[in-house]
Design a protein with these regions (language model features):
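His/Asp/Glu-enriched, well-ordered alpha-helical/loop segment
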Residues: 95, 100-112, 259, 300, ...
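Bacterial N-terminal signal peptides that target proteins for export
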Residues: 1-13
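Active-site gating loops and adjacent loop-to-helix segments of metal-dependent hydrolytic enzymes
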Residues: 97-119, 159, 184-202, 303-308
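Boundary at the C-terminal end of the N-terminal hydrophobic targeting segment
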Residues: 19-26
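Polyanionic/metal-chelating signatures
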Residues: 125, 130-284, 411
Length: 439
């Protein structure tokens, strides 16, 4: 069995500039003299960004600072929108084998559960990701079929409600697969050669695997039928109608206001997920579709956005091309498919910029790579008018760097989340400084 894993080779977050240098003291501040990478438009040399009450209110050259505003001189620096990890489990899972982890629910259908309620704001991985420029991410509740509601959060706050951007950005569905030897879904956390599961799952015959697949598909179809009946009964105010939180959570899916975030790795599951979405008349986002390159015309014809898994991973099968995960982003770009890149990890969101960078070496245009972890991610998650670029009216999620954030030698020197400066201190940095000072 081939387990997918990544080796961590990045240590940039251990080195950095002063944590809150030139931090604004008021609600209005002007970033002046930097190279501003808006992402939605051209790069602005010697540009300025004016922020008021957490929102960007001005972008351009030679902006004037209002009375009382803090002016931050950023000559020689770069300003980018904060990165968005469009699929992760930070704060949900500390140690994969620990019973204290709260990232996976039992039961086939749990659409009423919201990931944000289980997030631990004190997780040490949150400041580590933040210090490398990740300002928000999509928390993923895992489950057998429908795991719950994915929540988009800011990586700053002492309580769940203060971190929440959207408590219900999508609903997670692990699309059924014919698995003769099941592979853990979103297995992107391995730092060594060991699988994340304590016991390797036993192989089963194809006939048994196909039967299990058919049972799950039948259960999924029946569940959607039940939701439709529930919606009709609710609208008709039928006698004896009893509210059901599971069905209530699914009504926005049927109405088209909330998409399903569908995990479908192989070609067969991807085709099945698209056919299921057509039959149910629902919107979907394809999550971690490793074999998307095999069905590009199908995905494009249905206008389905894609959230790719990390590029820094091994091929899915032993006979896959060695560079398969590196080239898929460019394949999607050339096909005209909107896509983002995510880590699907409980502790490696800090490496998000390098996941995008790897695709650049294999053909993806540089600007498109950064869009895949900013503006594209925001648009796929329905937040394109609020996040993902440096434009007037958007939330001031900004990072200041001394170079290209997708380069491992670049330092993130300042981070603003919702217009507020945040600390770049991390446990890793404290340990680095502790042992650096050792006699």
């Amino acid at each position: 069995m081939l387990y997918r894993f990544r080796r961590i080779a990045w240590s940039g977050i251990l080195c950095g500039a002063p944590l809150l240098a030139q931090a604004p003291s008021g609600d209005v501040f002007l970033l002046r003299g930097a190279t501003v990478h808006t992402i939605s438009g051209p790069v602005i040399e010697d540009g300025s960004v004016l922020v008021r009450n957490g929102k960007i209110v001005g972008v351009g050259h030679n902006l004037s600072a209002p009375d009382g505003a803090t002016i931050i001189d950023l000559r020689g620096k770069h300003v980018y929108p904060g990165m968005i990890d469009a699929g992760a489990m930070l704060g949900l899972e500390k140690t994969s084998s620990s019973q204290a982890s709260d990232g996976h629910e039992i039961g086939l259908f749990n659409p009423q559960l919201r990931a944000v309620t289980a997030v631990n704001p004190a997780d040490e991985q949150i400041p580590a990701a933040r210090a490398n420029g990740v300002t928000s991410l999509l928390e993923m509740p895992m489950g057998d079929l429908i795991g719950g509601q994915l929540s988009l959060i800011h990586l700053d706050g002492s309580a769940n409600d203060s971190m929440t951007i959207s408590a219900s950005a999508a609903i997670y569905l692990r699309f059924p697969a014919i698995e003769t030897r099941p592979v853990p879904v979103h297995d992107h956390d391995d730092d060594d050669d060991e699988p994340t599961t304590a016991v390797e799952p036993e192989a089963v015959s194809y006939s048994l695997a196909k039967k299990a697949f058919e049972v799950k598909m039948q259960a999924l179809d029946t569940f959607f039928e039940d939701v439709r009946r529930y919606r009709v009964a609710k609208s008709a105010k039928a006698p004896g109608f009893a509210p059901d939180r599971r069905y209530e959570a699914m009504i926005p899916v049927l109405e088209g206001t909330t998409p399903m975030f569908v995990a479908a790795t192989r070609e067969r599951e991807i085709r099945g997920a698209i056919a299921f979405a057509d039959a149910q008349k629902i919107r979907i986002i394809l999550a971690d579709p490793f074999e998307a390159y095999k069905v590009l015309p199908l995905i494009k014809s249905h206008n389905i956005p894609v959230v790719l898994g990390p590029t820094l991973t091994l091929p899915l099968d032993v006979d896959d091309d060695y560079d398969r995960s590196y080239t898929t982003p460019n394949d999607l770009f050339k096909a005209g498919i909107t896509f983002a890149i995510a880590t699907f990890s409980s502790r490696l969101s800090r490496n998000l910029p390098y996941q995008a960078a790897a695709a650049v070496s294999f053909g993806l245009p540089h600007d498109e790579a950064y869009k895949a972890i900013t503006l594209n991610a925001a648009e796929i998650l329905g937040m394109g008018k609020r996040l993902g670029s440096i434009d007037e009216g958007k939330v001031a999620d900004l990072i200041v760097t001394d170079g290209d954030p997708m380069e491992t030698m670049t330092h993130v020197t300042q981070v603003f989340i919702d217009g507020k400066p945040v600390s770049l201190d991390t446990r890793q940095k404290r340990l680095y400084e502790k042992y650096l000072a050792r006699p």
